UniProtKB/Swiss-Prot annotation:
<keyword id="KW-0699">rRNA-binding</keyword>
<keyword id="KW-0689">Ribosomal protein</keyword>
<comment type="subunit">
    <text>Part of the 50S ribosomal subunit.</text>
</comment>
<comment type="similarity">
    <text>Belongs to the universal ribosomal protein uL16 family.</text>
</comment>
<dbReference type="GO" id="GO:0000049">
    <property type="term" value="F:tRNA binding"/>
</dbReference>
<comment type="function">
    <text>Binds 23S rRNA and is also seen to make contacts with the A and possibly P site tRNAs.</text>
</comment>
<keyword id="KW-0694">RNA-binding</keyword>
<dbReference type="Pfam" id="PF00252">
    <property type="entry name" value="Ribosomal_L16"/>
</dbReference>
<dbReference type="GO" id="GO:0006412">
    <property type="term" value="P:translation"/>
</dbReference>
<keyword id="KW-0687">Ribonucleoprotein</keyword>
<dbReference type="GO" id="GO:0003735">
    <property type="term" value="F:structural constituent of ribosome"/>
</dbReference>
<protein>
    <recommendedName>
        <fullName>Large ribosomal subunit protein uL16</fullName>
    </recommendedName>
</protein>
<dbReference type="InterPro" id="IPR047873">
    <property type="entry name" value="Ribosomal_uL16"/>
</dbReference>
<dbReference type="InterPro" id="IPR016180">
    <property type="entry name" value="Ribosomal_uL16_dom"/>
</dbReference>
<dbReference type="InterPro" id="IPR000114">
    <property type="entry name" value="Ribosomal_uL16_bact-type"/>
</dbReference>
<dbReference type="InterPro" id="IPR020798">
    <property type="entry name" value="Ribosomal_uL16_CS"/>
</dbReference>
<dbReference type="InterPro" id="IPR036920">
    <property type="entry name" value="Ribosomal_uL16_sf"/>
</dbReference>
Length: 140
């Protein structure tokens, strides 16, 4: 699972996923990419299951890039605990994905295989998505 080795603060403020992405908007490394069309938090478990789905379809010649990383820790208080007395303990790590962010990229495989691999990966994520080509500007 992906998670940071060290963080400056254990329990950060919540980061909003509203609005459009500023960076990470184009396919930079591969030939095809999986782009988010709305914002959401993507957990490290979702990223891992999408990675496995892509790597099953890639084979030995294909290459994959994961362009998101779960930097944000989400906290939760235990069940049946009264309000107050501080913030809860960190429960899971999430990546903040805004609309227009390219999350995964693949290369060195035929287009049909790339589309099925990215489709299988997209179905594992809690965000709406579309498949984009390198050099293609995706308008919302």
């Amino acid at each position: 699972m992906l998670e940071p080795k060290r963080t400056k603060y254990r329990r950060p403020h919540k980061v909003s996923y509203e609005g459009k992405a500023k960076g990470n908007k184009y396919v930079a490394f591969g030939e095809f990419g999986l782009m988010a069309t709305n914002g959401a938090w993507i957990s490290n478990r979702q990223i891992e299951s999408a990675r496995i789905a892509i790597s099953k379809a890639l084979g030995k010649t294909g290459k994959m890039w994961i362009r998101i990383f779960p930097h944000l820790s989400l906290t939760k208080k235990p069940l049946e605990v009264r309000m107050g007395s501080g913030k809860g303990s960190p429960e899971k790590w999430v990546a903040v994905v805004k609309a227009g962010t390219v999350m995964f990229e693949v290369a060195n495989i035929p287009e049909e295989v790339a589309r099925t691999a990215l489709k299988n990966a997209g179905n594992k994520l809690s965000v709406n998505w579309k498949i984009v080509k390198k050099g293609e500007i995706a308008h919302d």
